[in-house]
């Protein structure tokens, strides 16, 4: 009885906070801690759900704080997180529940994978990045700019020039924010979601069932890129390969309107993980383009529909009157006036509307559906735009299904990013938030409970070692010999993080040469990029010929970033001889611009005369000739301009503009 009274009293103690902030100490003692940060109104409305969530987290092995307040700025929230991070036990993660201020980050586009927008030319709300790295990457420093006058929960910050310029979050984080466009009582919805999390934490559920889907126009629609994902996921999710329903790979080509097949997948109770590789918007997942044309009439109708859609789109944008837009297309494509007779025919508009609706998953679809994959990854632009009233990822967790957590992006994201890096750690019981921390980007966020994890048959201490023993070299050397590929990858990452003397690269090159595991070789290549030495150059050269398409693609990107002339011959030959690897070829073509023009041109001319290429002679001649023309044309090869940066003839403004462009450039972000 005395012990119960003591625990109750401890749970009611509040620590000094900022303003009206209240900090409830954990009820249970564990080696690491977690913080639930919630706005005052949400906590007052649903205290039972918040506390039940706290209790479930503590039963799952984390001491959990509840921090509630009338949050007036992100700085106020961050101050509380910093204070908790200095306490014991060590804080490993946080979750932001309800209406927590949104930090809109500027001067940091080099930390994004793809988002590049002129911050001087475009409005703040468009050219800033909504990012919770403000809350979990505490070594970054910012200057406050201002609060948004229309959206009072948006606060603009500039990454300081003297701040660290790389992401290294010490904590993991998640957002539990109801998408108010859904139209229900948000406090009731948050409470129901939290009780769903509590129920799911009571289940024993190993990761043994997943589906991966690739949409149209993703990765240049390269079939090799799609096929080779299996090489990695066989290593990542070893328990899933039981039958045809537990490990699925779907592609937009498999049906005229794949969204309906995906609806079936999303409502499978046994599905643990759903991976979406697609293009996206805040309110839509782009799945396919509809049925392919059949016969001559089909192609004619397809062309007509495409032109009609473009005309209507231009009119909606206010680019001109319908007549003006039609006149432009008539002249551009040599059309007859009567071509547009049916442009606004009611039946045609209705048919087009239905067809367009069937090509993507929209919020209205999700509003009527319960989703069941416990974890959903949106490898897509904008699906994780938590700062908006309606966003795709939010609709996936706020329903009566069993989806607990999603990963999504608040801005656009690079297709070539290694999105499934170390995802196999989820099979080993690592928390979803911890995995996301290891692959952090400025725009990538966890939507939902970041403490969620799958069960493991044999308990181990890996999750605890990540937090408590990151610098124990002997321990990570032991893990590097694990039979589990992504545990090996994590171990080598930890060893590289401690390699202050830069002595590890020969071992990493040996690992890259000898490992039979695709994921491990890819991690070795990525880690070697830190060293930028001869070992790295050799790994790039070997990587251009690797069996795993993703390694070839990233080796191509690294070749351009590295720019070592020794790679020119291999880059040119692979570019010319492997047209079937469409995405690799795209990256290689971009990389060619980053080498000395005269040396690339010389190599191309040598191959032009050679018979040792697989492409037909005439095609090879034309392809090489066009490439030489692009490389030597200043209008097409802007890198010829950037060679002028050190010269005093350029104005300071021009130099700064060029430097900013190069800093922000992501030929590829891995």
For each of these PLM feature ranges, what is it?
Residues 464-465, 488-500, 519-531, 552-564, ...:
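Structural detector for internal amphipathic alpha-helices that build alpha-solenoid repeat scaffolds
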Residues 8-18:
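Hydrophobic h-region of N-terminal signal peptides that target proteins for export
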Residues 483-484, 516-517, 547-548, 579-581, ...:
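Short inter-helical turns and helix N-cap capping residues of alpha-solenoid HEAT/ARM repeat scaffolds
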Residues 75-256, 263-273, 282-296:
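Structured catalytic cores of large enzymes
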């Amino acid at each position: 009885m005395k012990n119960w009274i003591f625990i109750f009293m401890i749970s009611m103690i509040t620590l000094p906070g900022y303003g009206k902030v209240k900090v409830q100490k954990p009820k249970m003692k564990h080696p690491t801690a977690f913080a639930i940060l919630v706005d005052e109104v949400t906590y007052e409305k649903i205290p039972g759900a918040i506390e039940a969530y706290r209790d479930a987290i503590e039963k799952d092995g984390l001491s959990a704080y509840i921090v509630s307040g009338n949050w007036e700025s992100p700085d106020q929230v961050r101050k509380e997180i910093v204070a908790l991070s200095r306490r014991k036990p060590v804080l490993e993660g946080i979750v932001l529940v309800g209406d927590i201020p949104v930090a809109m980050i500027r001067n940091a586009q080099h930390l994004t994978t793809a988002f590049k927008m002129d911050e001087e030319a475009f409005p703040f709300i468009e050219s800033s990045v909504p990012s919770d790295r403000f809350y979990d990457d505490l070594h970054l420093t910012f200057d406050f700019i201002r609060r948004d006058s229309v959206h009072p929960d948006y606060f603009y910050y500039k990454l300081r020039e003297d701040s660290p310029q790389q992401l290294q979050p010490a904590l993991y984080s998640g957002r539990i924010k109801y998408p108010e466009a859904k139209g229900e009582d948000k406090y009731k919805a948050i409470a129901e979601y939290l009780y769903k999390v509590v129920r799911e934490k009571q289940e024993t559920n190993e990761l043994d069932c997943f589906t991966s889907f690739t949409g149209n126009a993703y990765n240049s629609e390269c079939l090799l890129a799609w096929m080779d994902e299996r090489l990695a996921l066989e290593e990542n999710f070893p328990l899933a390969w039981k039958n045809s329903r537990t490990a699925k790979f779907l592609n937009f080509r498999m049906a005229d309107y794949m969204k309906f097949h995906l609806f079936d997948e999303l409502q499978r109770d046994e599905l643990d993980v759903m991976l979406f590789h697609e293009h996206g918007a805040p309110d839509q997942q782009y799945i396919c383009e509809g049925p392919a044309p059949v016969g001559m009439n089909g192609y004619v109708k397809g062309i007509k529909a495409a032109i009609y859609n473009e005309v209507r789109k231009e009119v909606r944008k206010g680019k001109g009157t319908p007549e003006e837009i039609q006149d432009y297309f008539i002249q551009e494509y040599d059309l007859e006036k009567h071509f547009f007779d049916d442009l606004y025919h009611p039946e045609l508009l209705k048919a087009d509307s239905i067809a367009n609706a069937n090509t993507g998953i929209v919020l209205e679809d999700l509003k009527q559906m319960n989703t069941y994959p416990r974890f959903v990854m949106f490898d897509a632009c904008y699906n994780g735009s938590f700062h908006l009233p309606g966003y795709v990822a939010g609709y996936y967790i706020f329903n009566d299904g069993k989806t607990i957590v999603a990963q999504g992006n608040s801005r656009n994201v690079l297709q070539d990013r290694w999105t499934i890096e170390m995802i196999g750690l989820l099979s080993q019981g690592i928390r979803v938030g911890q995995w996301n921390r290891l692959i952090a980007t400025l725009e990538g966020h966890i939507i939902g409970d970041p403490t969620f994890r799958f069960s493991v048959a044999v308990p181990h201490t890996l999750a605890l070692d990540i937090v408590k023993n990151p610098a124990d070299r002997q321990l990570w050397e032991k893990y590097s010999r694990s039979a589990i590929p992504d545990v090996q990858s994590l171990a080598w990452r930890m060893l590289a993080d401690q390699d202050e003397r830069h002595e590890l690269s020969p071992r990493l090159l040996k690992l890259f040469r000898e490992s039979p595991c695709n994921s491990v070789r890819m991690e070795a290549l990525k880690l070697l990029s830190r060293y930028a030495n001869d070992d790295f150059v050799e790994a790039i050269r070997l990587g251009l010929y690797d069996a795993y398409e993703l390694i070839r693609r990233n080796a191509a990107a690294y070749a351009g970033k590295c720019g070592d002339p020794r790679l020119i011959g291999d880059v040119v030959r692979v570019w010319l001889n492997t047209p079937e690897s469409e995405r690799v070829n795209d990256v290689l073509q971009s990389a060619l611009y980053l080498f000395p023009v005269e040396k690339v041109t010389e190599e191309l001319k040598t191959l032009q005369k050679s018979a040792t290429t697989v492409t037909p002679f005439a095609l090879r001649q034309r392809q090489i000739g066009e490439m030489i023309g692009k490389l030597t044309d200043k209008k097409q090869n802007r890198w010829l301009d950037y060679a002028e940066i050190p010269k005093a003839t350029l104005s300071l403004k021009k130099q700064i503009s060029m430097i900013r462009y190069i800093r922000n450039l992501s030929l590829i972000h891995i």
